[in-house]
Each structure stands twice: as structure tokens, then as C-alpha cells.
Amino acid sequence: MRVTAPRTLLLLLSGGLALTETWAGSHSLRYFDTAVSRPGRREPRFISVGYVDDTQFVRFDSDAASPRGEPRAPWVEQEGPEYWDRETQKYKRQAQADRVSLRNLRGYYNQSEDGSHTLQWMYGCDLGPDGRLLRGYGQSAYDGKDYIALNEDLRSWTAADTAAQITQRKWEAAREAEQLRAYLEGKRVESCRRYLENGKETLQRTECPKTHMTHHPVSDHEATLRCWALAFYPAEITLTWQRDGEDQIQDTELVETRPAGDGTFQKWAAVVVPSGQEQRYTCHVQHEGLPEPLTLRWKPTSQPTIPIVGIVAGLAVLAVLAVLGAVVTAMMCRRKSSGGKGGSCSQAACSNSAQGSDESLIACKA
């Protein structure tokens, strides 16, 4: 492996440098790279995206009309032409390293040139509130299966199979882990620090979750209660179901936190309960933007007893009130800060319903 381009996703960052200021909570810098071989075409397609705290800030696509590193967040647009030139060259070197790796891997697995194959890398680091390294990580996959990963000590590798052991022996002989560790403890942490400072108005803000609960009959005897948390930032959140005060971890269906498409995140957790026993279950929501955890309990709606005309008129009034309420809630819940931990939003406001450019990375080849 050569110390040049940021190579495919196994590089992770790390570092032990202190920041000159303190940030709320931990922060992360992650890159996701994908190289896909295409039979009949000379070069595989290479795509790389970078995230700071789960917010995409950069992208590169080798199939673009003019392949270059492209900004995906306003705060990174302030970087000058030299930065983007270095980024573009970095991605091109990385793409070339992945092309070589794809060819090598095809040989390791005794595969023909007829099929399409995929090499993926994920690498990154987490920094603490003081800007020091909490952990570094990196892992790769070939055709959707684990291949090789850097261990937590940042000094050794774990191979998933005998083919990956070939790569492991190559990298151990070349002392790649040592080079990688030294690189990560320097430039990667510096880059993360700079991104957090430049994007602090966005990256260090807090938006508390909008929550509600839904009820879905499964049969005559059971129903699903689903606890929703929407429009929150940062992405870290905890949803917990309890029955009579006891956690229902084994019986909870929990989806991964996912982007909402507007810079915020959403998540839900569900539990199947016996019909008529819904009141025994509560959902507990914890998030940095909340002054204290929220507790939600299902409240069944009463049957309508007013005339249909009254219903229509009432809905019209409620629609107006809902718009006004949403504006007020948004004003109360949205907080942009440059450091303080914890939100300024109240439980009532937040609950909708109680129901550094890298001059080089390590372009290692498998």
C-alpha cells in the first residue's frame, strides 16, 4: 500500500490532539466509498461521500461529466480552489487504488471477468467534547460480505476469510497499520476539528424531537403501538418501551435512525400489546435537545358524536390552529448553539402528542 490517496474505505481516522474549545457531546467524521466493476467497460465506477455528524458535506462520482470533489453543505463551500483541487486528486488516487483491489480480489476468489463486483469501505473517527480521539474505525466489504477490518487498537487487522488473510499478510509485512495510525492521529483529527468549527452553526445546533404515538390493530386480540420521534438533531436518540415500568427490550421492534431529507432525523420503536392493555405501556424518549426524557402513553380517541357539518367546521379550525402551533413549536424547539449541551425546548413544546482536506490518505491495495 502506498501512502497517497485516501484509499478505499478502510482508513479511519483517529488522533489525540486537543481542541482549543469544548463542544457539546461527541462528534464523528465518516467516509463511505463504493467501487463497482462493470463488465465490458474499462474502469469501475467509484463514488465517495463524507459525513460530519451524519450530515453529508462532500461527494465524488467518477461517472460525473467532470469528476471533482463536490460540496454538499454550505459551510464547506467556503473552502478555496486549492482545497478542492487536493480533494479531487485524493479521490482520483483512491479510485485507482480500488480498481487495482477489485482486480486482485477477483483473483483471490477465483472469479471470472464476466460478473460485476463491489468493494465498499467505511472509515472514520469519533472525537470527544474536548476534541480528543475517542475511537477510530474502518472496515471493508466485498460483494456485500465482510472482508477486512482495522481493530480497535489501530495496530492490527481482522480478516473475515482466507482470501482476506492474503491482504492481511501483505499489510502486516508493509507495516500498514502503523502508517495508518500515524496518519490518522494527525491529519484526520485536524480535518474533523476544522469542519466542526466551520460548520458549527449547523453541526452544533440542537432540534428536539417531535413525538407522537400510533395504534395499529393486528388482530382481535393484539395491537401494535408505534412510538415516533421526528425532526430531531443531532441523530443520537433513545426510544425505550416499558410495561408497568419494566423495559421491554426483547419485545421491541426498533428501526435505525434515518435521515428525514431536510437535515434532521427520524426514528420509531414498536411493541405488540394485548388489546385492552395499551395503558400498561409507555414509551420513553431521550435526546440531547430535551431538558428531561419524554414519556408517552396511548390515549384512545373517543367516538364522534357531533354532526358531520360540525366535524368539517371543526377540522377547518384545527387545521389553522395546527399551522400556528407548528410555527410556535418550531420556534421553541429550534436552537442553534455554538457549544452548550441540552436544548432550550420544553417537554410540552417538543411533544406533538402524548399519544481539512487530506493531502493524502493511504491508498492501500488489497
From Swiss-Prot:
PROSITE patterns: IG_LIKE, IG_MHC
CDD domains per the UniProt record, alphabetical: IgC1_MHC_I_alpha3 (cd07698)
GO cellular component: early endosome membrane; ER to Golgi transport vesicle membrane; external side of plasma membrane; extracellular space; lumenal side of endoplasmic reticulum membrane; MHC class I protein complex; phagocytic vesicle membrane; recycling endosome membrane
Primary role: Involved in the presentation of foreign antigens to the immune system.
Claim: Transmembrane is one of the keywords in the record: yes
Secretion signal span: 1-24
S-S bonds: 125-192, 227-283
Residues with attached carbohydrate: 110
Stretches assigned to the Extracellular side: 25-308
Family in the record: Belongs to the MHC class I family.
Region (Alpha-1): 25-114
Pfam families assigned to the protein according to its UniProt record, in alphabetical order: C1-set (PF07654), MHC_I (PF00129), MHC_I_C (PF06623)
Cytoplasmic side: 333-366
GO function term, MF aspect, one: peptide antigen binding
Domain Ig-like C1-type, residue spans: 209-297
Listed transmembrane segments: 309-332
Naturally occurring in which organism (per UniProt): Pan troglodytes (Chimpanzee)
Region (Connecting peptide): 299-308
Membrane-related topology note: Single-pass type I membrane protein
Subcellular location: Membrane
Protein name: Patr class I histocompatibility antigen, C alpha chain
Any single GO BP term: antigen processing and presentation of endogenous peptide antigen via MHC class Ib
Phosphoprotein recorded as keyword: yes
Domain of life: Eukaryota
Keywords: Disulfide bond, Glycoprotein, Immunity, Membrane, MHC I, Phosphoprotein, Signal, Transmembrane, Transmembrane helix
